[in-house]
Amino acid sequence: EVFILPNLYGDILTDEAAEFQGGVGTAGSANLGKRYAMFEAIHGSAPRMVEEGREIYADPSSVIRAGAMLLSHSGYQEQADRLFAALEACAAEKKLTVTGRPDGATGAQYTDYILSKL
């Protein structure tokens, strides 16, 4: 389905919907136009984590998911499916989680694990 909403309400709705897949840190985003498309993490980067010295704990799954969406949109469905499957395998196995705290995996460890699943 397609919803057309003002930015504020779209933001609220996507935040709530993202909770079904693990939170806003796991959601990719697609902005599709007639001629152009842009893919990104649902809420962009994590500058507050950088300011607090916790940048290595930023969760990269939203950017990885956006990358899979870009692959799909660009006609690389097989590669997109493999990337989506790697994300799902990582989530299902719960081997590595990025918590934003020192007790979780770093973004690099998580990304390496995703790459090993490809």
Tell me what each language-model feature is.
Residues 77, 82, 86-118:
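Glycine-rich phosphate/pyrophosphate-binding loop and the adjoining helix
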Residues 1-82, 86-94:
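Glycine-rich phosphate/nucleotide-binding loop
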